[in-house]
């Protein structure tokens, strides 16, 4: 995928709590991307209508999901972006239902053999993907299953894995006091936007 002069970085917010820790860190990451000269956009999944995958396999044939909801527009935004940064809290040792429904719907990009649909491959090849996780547990590795899911997706599909920022914050907004976490998120955004 040829890089534009101004990179486009898409932020995907997977928490239902706008203004919460995941949202604050995603804003930091997008500020870092913007500081590096990128055009940025944020999508809040909880404000979108996204149904779960029905495993009907129609997208394996056409590359287009038959479910007519907001994910169709998000697919277009993913294709247009040079990098995607996801931010999600840990809910019951995994990602939120909003993020899971979104990630499952990525199957529209693939054929039945889990290879890129040929018309998507040129637009997805080398696309950068990063992750921010926030958990209430002091042990940030509580988020390991989420990191594994996103990193494995990147490896399987030959996306460029930017890495994960893993943090801990128990109450809404607590992360604002964590200068290290904010800097790590900012730096992830800069990395996403640097050619």
Task: List where the protein language model places each region.
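A short beta-strand-loop structural module common to alpha/beta enzyme folds
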Residues: 38-48
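N-terminal beta1-alpha1 ligand-phosphate binding loop
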Residues: 7-38
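Residue-level recognition of beta-strand->loop/alpha-helix junctions
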Residues: 13, 44, 165-166
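Short, hinge-like loop/turn segments at secondary-structure boundaries
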Residues: 57-61, 104, 180-182
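Glycine-rich phosphate/pyrophosphate-binding loop and the adjoining helix
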Residues: 7, 35-36, 141, 147-195
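Helix-loop-strand module that forms the ligand-binding subsite of alpha/beta enzymes
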Residues: 66-155
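Short, Lys/Arg-enriched N-terminal segments with co-localized hydrophobic residues
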Residues: 1-6
